[in-house]
Regions:
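Glycine-rich anion/phosphate-binding loop at the beta-strand->alpha-helix junction
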Residues: 184, 235, 244-338, 342
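Glycine-rich cofactor-pocket loops
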Residues: 149-171, 283-299, 332-339, 364-384
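A helix-coil-helix interface module used to build multimeric assemblies
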Residues: 2-208, 214-229, 292-293, 303-307, ...
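Short, well-ordered beta-strand elements within core beta-sheets of diverse protein domains
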Residues: 125, 172, 253-261, 388-396
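Active-site-adjacent "gating/activation" loops or surface patches in catalytic cores
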Residues: 218-246
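Long, amphipathic alpha-helical stalk/connector segments used for oligomerization, subunit docking
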Residues: 307, 314-400, 406
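Active/binding-pocket-proximal capping segment
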Residues: 283, 406-413
Length: 486
């Protein structure tokens, strides 16, 4: 007995993933749980046995009934003991199921190979996990759309290269976040629509074992697979046309890549909000007793957005695992895919699930500081309005070249005062002292709404054309509140 084995065991005595303890929702954790996985295996064995019974193989109705009665009473300790002895997880659960249903023991897994169970179960679980992600992307899009509509016409300074640029609106900027999320949602929906079962194919995908069981009758082999798929709630024509021992591992690469695209969209949204928090323009929700720093009591850190970007970055970096695994599968299959998939697939979903819950929470409680937004606009608008000032002066008879030179000189001087002396932008004050600009309504030329183009109308069109159809498709789940534990 090792020293470690003598220690009392509780939930704090070993490693637990933060994805489980801090980030992922109960629903996503349940989807990737051992109970869900092995319960799905048993349902696959039941579907196989029932289909074999209906085709006249030596599987009795009583045996099928016994299997159905024991789908969920899984003795995990017994399964662990079998696996420690057999070193094979599928066979360990064959024996465990047989212990629970002893009269059916002899027909469990009849004609099957491990991947007839594992690949089909993984497909069912992946479909459900992708559905959760799709629903949560739709929820984030809905909340971003609501925010965009509320602030559709509120001017704010635009930024390119993180340098002041032409104004936009707070709502228009939010549509950019929602559009990225909508692109990600389309990716996820495409993955769901394209999913196929592996079907019943045997050890190398040739169906040789089933052909032998069914007396060489190919039509019965095809009927067996159709019946099996239907009993799992899957369209009979949605199995892979051909496969080796597993379904194509490029499918995992596609799924991980689609999750990475969603993660990149989340990362962009939350990074933008972190920058805006620094500018004191928009902040994520901050609770009454929340602490920003153990040392600096005044701090209001955007910790939710920071955590979401950290989780998103983790998901993006997992995507390479799927490509590596698909590329290195030899011939009909090698087992080096297994250990990697047990980590990369569930953890990508768990991390993205947590990031999406955070994003929905943030979008639902954003705090907009109008005064800060206006102050930053006021500091930059005189420069941006310089062309309109030039045109207005020329229209009143001023020499265009003289007016241009005056604006240039005063703009440079005002810019120097702002950058080098920390003074406010006094360009308008300087221009008011020039006879060239006498009588011009300079303040009127600084109406920020005159510089936002069609931003409000673009918001309206985007919400109507993109957000509203998503709301309609996901109306059953879009109002679900996110679980944010810390």
């Amino acid at each position: 007995v090792t020293k470690d084995a003598t220690h009392a065991v509780d939930e704090h005595s070993g490693y637990r993933s933060p994805l489980e303890t801090r980030n992922a929702s109960a629903r996503m954790r349940s989807t990737w749980s051992a109970r869900r996985k092995f319960g799905t295996w048993r349902r696959i064995w039941l579907a196989l046995a029932e289909s074999q019974h209906e085709l006249g193989l030596a599987v009795t109705a009583a045996q099928v009934t016994e299997l159905r009665a024991h789908l969920d009473d899984i003795d995990f300790a017994n399964a662990d003991a079998h696996e420690a002895r057999l070193r094979h997880d599928v066979m360990a659960h064959v024996h465990t199921f047989g212990d629970a249903a002893p009269h059916a023991r002899g027909i469990i897994h009849l004609g099957a190979t491990s991947q007839d169970v594992v690949c089909n179960a993984d497909t069912l679980i992946l479909r459900d996990a992708l559905t959760i992600i799709a629903e949560k992307l739709a929820r984030a899009i809905d909340r971003a759309g609501t925010f965009a509509t509320e602030y559709r016409a509120l001017p704010t300074l635009g930024w390119t290269h993180f340098q002041p640029a032409q104004p936009t609106t707070v709502g228009k900027r939010a549509t950019l976040w929602a559009q990225d999320l909508a692109i990600a949602l389309s990716e996820i929906e495409g993955r769901i629509d394209g999913m196929r079962l592996r079907g019943l194919r045997g050890a190398t995908g040739t169906q040789a074992s089933y052909l032998g069981l069914l007396g060489g009758d190919a039509a019965k082999v095809e009927a067996l697979e159709r019946s099996f798929a239907a009993k799992l709630g899957w369209p009979a024509d949605r199995c892979w046309p051909v496969c080796g021992q597993t379904y194509p591992r490029l499918v995992d690469a596609q799924i991980l890549s689609s999750l990475a695209i969603a993660a990149a969209a989340i990362h962009k949204c939350c990074n933008d909000l972190r920058l805006l928090a620094n500018l004191k323009e928009i902040e994520e929700p901050f609770e009454a007793e929340q602490i920003g720093s153990s040392a600096m009591a005044y701090k209001r850190n955007p910790m939710r957005c920071e955590r979401a970007t950290g989780l998103a970055r983790f998901v993006m970096n997992l995507s390479g695992n799927g490509l590596d695994t698909a590329a290195t599968q030899w011939l009909e299959r090698t087992l080096d895919d297994s250990a990697n998939r047990r980590l990369s697939l569930p953890e990508a979903f768990l991390a993205l699930d947590g990031a999406l819950d955070i994003l929905a929470n943030v979008f639902g409680g954003l705090v907009v500081h109008r005064a800060s937004i206006r102050a930053r606009l006021d500091a930059e608008l005189p420069f941006m309005a310089s062309e309109d000032i030039l045109l207005a002066a020329t229209a009143r008879g001023a020499d265009r070249q003289h007016a241009h030179e005056a604006i240039r000189v005063h703009s440079q001087a005002a810019g120097h005062a702002v950058k080098s002396e920390g003074k406010p932008n006094d360009l308008l004050t300087r221009l008011r002292g020039e006879a060239l600009f006498a009588g011009l309504d300079l303040d009127g030329l600084l109406d920020a709404s005159a510089y936002i183009g069609r931003a409000p109308e673009q918001v309206d069109a985007f919400v109507a054309d993109v957000v509203q159809p998503i709301r309609t498709r996901y109306r059953a789940t879009i109002a679900d509140e996110p679980q944010v534990r810390v």
